Amino acid sequence: MSNSRNNRVMVEGVGARVVRGPDWKWGKQDGGEGHVGTVRSFESPEEVVVVWDNGTAANYRCSGAYDLRILDSAPTGIKHDGTMCDTCRQQPIIGIRWKCAECTNYDLCTVCYHGDKHHLRHRFYRITTPGSERVLLESRRKSKKITARGIFAGARVVRGVDWQWEDQDGGNGRRGKVTEIQDWSASSPHSAAYVLWDNGAKNLYRVGFEGMSDLKCVQDAKGGSFYRDHCPVLGEQNGNRNPGGLQIGDLVNIDLDLEIVQSLQHGHGGWTDGMFETLTTTGTVCGIDEDHDIVVQYPSGNRWTFNPAVLTKANIVRSGDAAQGAEGGTSQFQVGDLVQVCYDLERIKLLQRGHGEWAEAMLPTLGKVGRVQQIYSDSDLKVEVCGTSWTYNPAAVSKVASAGSAISNASGERLSQLLKKLFETQESGDLNEELVKAAANGDVAKVEDLLKRPDVDVNGQCAGHTAMQAASQNGHVDILKLLLKQNVDVEAEDKDGDRAVHHAAFGDEGAVIEVLHRGSADLNARNKRRQTPLHIAVNKGHLQVVKTLLDFGCHPSLQDSEGDTPLHDAISKKRDDILAVLLEAGADVTITNNNGFNALHHAALRGNPSAMRVLLSKLPRPWIVDEKKDDGYTALHLAALNNHVEVAELLVHQGNANLDIQNVNQQTALHLAVERQHTQIVRLLVRAGAKLDIQDKDGDTPLHEALRHHTLSQLRQLQDMQDVGKVDAAWEPSKNTLIMGLGTQGAEKKSAASIACFLAANGADLSIRNKKGQSPLDLCPDPNLCKALAKCHKEKVSGQVGSRSPSMISNDSETLEECMVCSDMKRDTLFGPCGHIATCSLCSPRVKKCLICKEQVQSRTKIEECVVCSDKKAAVLFQPCGHMCACENCANLMKKCVQCRAVVERRVPFIMCCGGKSSEDATDDISSGNIPVLQKDKDNTNVNADVQKLQQQLQDIKEQTMCPVCLDRLKNMIFLCGHGTCQLCGDRMSECPICRKAIERRILLY
């Protein structure tokens, strides 16, 4: 590997952590001064790709102009063997070495140097790589210090561009918090971040290791301060020279006797017979290895490694420069000199190593004449040739004599014409570049001057952008007005199809959008991803720009290439404020994206309760809450499937969602919740009145699903136990017992069994058979669970609390009065707000959720004696106030709670608060419940007829308003023939699907 390659990988290496440099001109792409990024790769010798911690990735200059500084090169793995940081004792120092210039043998690592260790008045040498030149710096006491920001401890992050860890974070868009910056490996310090995700998972992720960026910060954190001007500039070539004076590209000879050469070669590559060619031939230095031995290439193509003491730099005389040689350390060229590039492709490739490197784009410059623009400190030349600028090894070019000297007048005239043509072209390009740069920087005076020039192109581009686009993104309204007076093309597109209005939306420039609107810019313009400016403003979170666009009539519901509307994007970005603004502007909730999700589906899928709350509060038509996807899933199905409890609660209680809608597999939301063992969703749906006996396409009810899941989990556990070791004969008699007892082991089994019991206790039919002829009990091999299910179902159906024997009641009462935690003390603590009594006062502080209903415990009240008679303990819960302050005898006499004076609407006995049933209340409930049930059955006939009528009317309305092509979305685009479709289908058509006339114009409906 050549020395330049070593330096580029290590000094300017992949993985280095960087900040903006001295020639930075890219605004806030990095997030602002002090924000940190990671070197990802090198596009060319002059361009480096950086991924900033905020997620932005772009190319930056690292030759000629320097956009970046290296904050910390430790992640690249560069190490200074034999050194030690005298403060933190890191050994060896990895990254940049800082050596005190005033103390003997005192070194610091990067962290300690910027952390103000050692004397601040002392000056230091900066040593970027082993063997590189030492750079003397000013004392830190006199230098400017700024704060680093990005992915540091405390930052909030999401997955980044190199994420490959599946759903460790809980899913795309889920957030986590960086707790510490750590080492990904021992040889790559500070190259990883330890993250605690919001879902509770935690792990180490790459931030710099091999250029990888697993994370992107959504809320940066401070990472300490650093001395900006002391950080090396990324791309400066300080390390290409060898201590012996040789550098890559130098021509060398061997002038010593054979015996001496052979002696010097010991330990430096040795000597072989094939090396005799080197004694009489000039070679070219093509590399310098880690031991500072020199790798030389010869015309034969062979490469040999030499001790530097063997080689002598060749003294080459150029044509047109007979009096000057290449030695002496001073350049033979001056700025403005005309030079001719070498014709030999292979030779120039070799010479360019370590001198700007070779790029295929340089091919047109071979043999061409150019002008020296700049001479670097290492004598490399920046040459303007063929309309571009390249860095060349001085050995790769030769001076061109003037027209009045050695060459003929005719040749001089031809050369003059060539150069004139060359630089006229370059001047024209520079003029457009200056205009774009001046517009981007807000330089009104310069823009005015440039616009007065007749040869300026007001629509000319620099780096793919026009002056209009640059001014729009940076908010320079005065320049926009100047450009509009020059009849600038406001609809000009960049390589991504973005127009000026897109750039204004990206830059959060509402005033610019107002100016562009007055200039007749299309606010609904689409880029190559079919995004409108509104899409971009929503994605960037620019609320004011969103309002401005909508105020000026921007369509709120156009779809991008993925079918997403701005509503979808606002939900994904969790911007409820923007979501509300879009809905106020009439954004269509029913439009579905390419995956079939409308806004409600999307919010349910994402588990975004705040967005769901906003959507439900502003639904234009209440039945939209039950809209189905192509697969029959409603928003409630999606919430149940993904265990988004808050979203499901909103859909049930606020949206009044139909609980019994079936998907294409005829599954209800309850089927899905039971199948996935989502206990809270099951409880919610059952208590809200979901039907328990609806059958899916296989004839299974939710109870079938629960018991099948329970049995399968038992079999899996049995298989696991058998995998550990063979079951011997002694186990055979008890195998059935083992299977039956598995139901009590493991949370998964408990969950399935408890769901089954809950369904049975709420009236699920145990006798319904599926298409295989199986009842729920046929799927349950556990006799104990079967008995429990039968008992729960029987109690629900017959209300047999009153028929139970006194001994059973007595035993049940004793059990119900025991603390559910310790079983030693009696229950004496009332949980609020649920009103259950589950533990004693000693155990209650340890309980976060009620052990009976699983609701969050917000208050704990110890049950004292009756406040009226003081003879017995309080034993009746008053509703709705939730106080328990009187015994049974006294409570029956009260019409108001003696504690809060609220009217008592219901009295709940102590035993019911413990999870049991009161015989008295059970009888009352049954007797009072019979008549409404019968009445409800009578009413159902009339209700069903009304519902069928309304459904038919709704179907008629849908046929009139739905797109005739996809039958999913509302018509919102009309053609000149009078027919219409939805916007997504209309964009893809060239003729009307109804009358087959060619589509001349598409008109969007508002």
UniProtKB/Swiss-Prot annotation:
Ligand binding (Zn(2+) 1): C85, C88, C109, C112
Compartments reported by the entry: Cytoplasm; Cytoplasm, Cytoskeleton, Microtubule organizing center, Centrosome, Centriolar satellite; Cell membrane
Ranges where the MIB/HERC2 domain occurs: 6-74, 143-221
Enzyme Commission number, as recorded: 2.3.2.27
Tissue specificity annotation: Widely expressed at low level. Expressed at higher level in spinal cord, ovary, whole brain, and all specific brain regions examined.
Zn finger (ZZ-type) location: 80-132
A Pfam family assignment: Ank
Residue ranges crossing the lipid bilayer per the database entry: none
Miscellaneous: In epilepsy brain tissue, levels of expression are increased in the cytoplasm and microsomal fractions (endoplasmic reticulum).
Disease: Left ventricular non-compaction 7: A form of left ventricular non-compaction, a cardiomyopathy due to myocardial morphogenesis arrest and characterized by a hypertrophic left ventricle, a severely thickened 2-layered myocardium, numerous prominent trabeculations, deep intertrabecular recesses, and poor systolic function. Clinical manifestations are variable. Some affected individuals experience no symptoms at all, others develop heart failure. In some cases, left ventricular non-compaction is associated with other congenital heart anomalies. LVNC7 is an autosomal dominant condition.
Subunit details: Interacts with CEP131 and PCM1.
Name of the protein: E3 ubiquitin-protein ligase MIB1
Organism ancestry: Eukaryota, Metazoa, Chordata, Craniata, Vertebrata
Gene this chain is encoded by: MIB1
